Regions:
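Flexible nucleotide-interacting loop at or near the entrance of a catalytic core
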Residues: 1-10, 207-253
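ABC ATP-binding cassette signature C-motif
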Residues: 1-214
Length: 253
């Protein structure tokens, strides 16, 4: 996936969310996507999905799918919801993925709205990961999972390849990603490693930048003090000249 000179701002806004962003990611990577709330994580996922116009280019050799999928009519059978998510699904692949998520395939023949939130999460992940040549954009999958469910889904994702994961659960991210996408102001950076590795690098970088900033402040203070001293010396010299009075010159006759 190649992103080149991506620039985007919402219509009517004079401030760019992204500005000249360029990076490349491998479609086999498991990427965690981090950044402060409101910095543009969901916006970027929507750009990958082609929902907004933008400047620059995004090229990919894979199709993108978004989690969570919005099932409009939740009264339908779960198997019909599967077909809505993936019309070309293969039943045995769905069963395989469901088994890996410890989800009994009997849920497929229940009304979708009778599934617990955790079962719905697992079913959707099973369907989306059964797709071929597909890259998942996974947005907060742990919202409706208990601790055991989170551990199970984390182990499941660790066996997969090709996704971007947004999650506020740091332990969850640590357990299943091998790269980090991070939003820094209007730019996006790619780092190898899990969330803890990225955080350690970020803290070192922040400490270095803070030290450099303090160093610059001290240098500015030193230069200002030197300038004040020189100005003081100049004022003292001028006052001495004034106290000594004008030089008398004898008339030469």
């Amino acid at each position: 996936i190649q992103v080149s000179n991506l620039t985007f701002a919402y219509e009517g806004s004079h401030e760019n969310i992204f500005e000249n962003v360029s990076f490349q990611i491998d479609t086999n990577w498991r990427l965690g996507f981090v950044g402060r709330n409101g910095r543009g994580k969901t916006t970027f996922l929507n750009l990958l999905l082609g929902k907004y116009d933008y400047q620059g280019s995004i090229s990919a050799s894979v199709a993108f799918s978004y989690f969570p999928y919005s099932v409009e009519d939740k009264s339908i059978l779960a198997i019909d919801a599967v077909e809505a998510m993936y019309p070309d699904y293969e039943y045995w692949k769905i069963q395989r993925e469901m088994a890996n998520l410890h989800l009994d395939d009997g849920v497929l023949y229940r009304p979708y709205d009778t599934l617990s939130n955790g079962e719905q999460t697992k079913l959707q992940l099973a369907v989306l990961f059964s797709k071929e040549n597909n890259f998942l954009l996974i947005d907060e999958p742990t919202n409706h999972l208990d601790i055991r469910g989170r551990e199970l889904v984390s182990r499941y994702l660790r066996t997969k390849k090709g996704f971007i994961l947004v999650s506020h659960d740091r332990a969850f991210l640590d357990g299943c990603v091998d790269h980090i996408l991070s939003i820094n102001k209007s730019d996006i950076q790619v780092c190898k490693g899990n969330f803890s590795t990225w955080m350690e690098n970020k803290q070192r970088q922040d400490a270095f930048e803070q030290a450099e900033n303090e160093k610059r402040k001290r240098e500015i203070s030193r230069l200002e003090e030197t300038a004040r001293e020189k100005a003081g010396w100049s004022d003292t010299a001028d006052r001495r000249k004034l106290r000594s009075g004008p030089l008398e010159v004898d008339n030469v006759k």
